[in-house]
From Swiss-Prot:
Lineage summary: Bacteria, Bacillati, Bacillota, Clostridia, Eubacteriales
Family membership: Belongs to the PdxS/SNZ family.
Gene name as annotated: pdxS
E.C. number(s) listed in UniProt: 4.3.3.6
Protein name, UniProt field: Pyridoxal 5'-phosphate synthase subunit PdxS
Positions annotated to bind D-glyceraldehyde 3-phosphate: R107
Length: 232
């Protein structure tokens, strides 16, 4: 799959008052140039689309539009940030309604951050080499205990409880697409997920907003998928 029709993207931009994000294929510089030219607010260099380049991601520093990129671990996150990404998200399996991959990626990144925080400074160069990440970004994570950009959860989030779980695991926010639009009552579910993110440490509130939402999207087993996006 490829970038959406620019005409449709422009129609969406004209129809809504909120920022609009659109996907480009990994490594496809021209798709990103097109989106910037038509006035998109954010670009997602996304593994959900068929990659255009299996070696290189886009040099995001050459663009004025902010990019979001996926990451399964700290090394991937810091490499994308080194290329200019302004936001990181998990590479959960989009369209599955199964949150397990997003959970795995967030736990992995948080665990690796905790290890860096207690690492002697003289070991950071080795850690940077093992992570395949820029030394200055590794040093930042050690000193601050977090990524230098915000880290969202994405992929497989289908319920208010899923969203609250990801917030409790340490993410800064969540992306939800098919989990809302493939559910029985998209508008009500969207509002409930927003409330769950705002009140992620309040089980009673999450229980309240989870009532009467109708059927959630059908969940899929990750190990039965022919293709997993996270591997891209």
């Amino acid at each position: 799959s490829r970038m959406s029709d620019p005409k449709m993207i422009k129609e969406i931009i004209d129809a809504v008052s909120i920022p609009v994000m659109a996907k480009v294929r990994i490594g496809h510089v021209v798709e990103a140039q097109i989106l910037q030219a038509i006035g998109i607010d954010y670009i997602d260099e996304s593994e959900v689309l068929t990659p255009a380049d299996d070696l290189f991601h886009i040099n995001k520093k050459e663009f004025n539009v902010p990019f979001v990129c996926g990451a399964r671990n700290l090394g991937e996150a810091l490499r994308r940030i080194g290329e200019g990404a302004c936001m990181i998200r998990t590479k959960g399996e989009a369209g599955t309604g199964n949150v397990i991959e997003a959970v795995r990626h967030m736990r992995t990144i948080q665990s690796q951050i905790r290890k860096l925080k207690v690492m002697p400074k003289e070991e950071l160069m080795i850690a940077a080499k093992e992570l395949g990440a820029p030394y200055d970004l590794v040093e930042y994570v050690r000193e601050n205990g977090k990524l230098p950009v915000i880290n969202f959860a994405a992929g497989g989030i289908a319920t208010p409880a899923d969203a609250a779980l990801m917030m409790q695991l340490g993410c800064d926010g969540v992306f939800v697409g098919s989990g809302i639009f493939k559910s029985e009552n998209p508008a009500k579910r969207a509002k409930a997920i927003v409330e769950a993110v705002k009140n992620y440490n309040n089980p009673l509130k999450i229980a309240e907003v989870s009532e009467g939402l109708g059927e959630a999207m059908t969940g899929l087993e990750i190990d039965k998928l022919d293709v997993t996006f996270a591997e891209r």
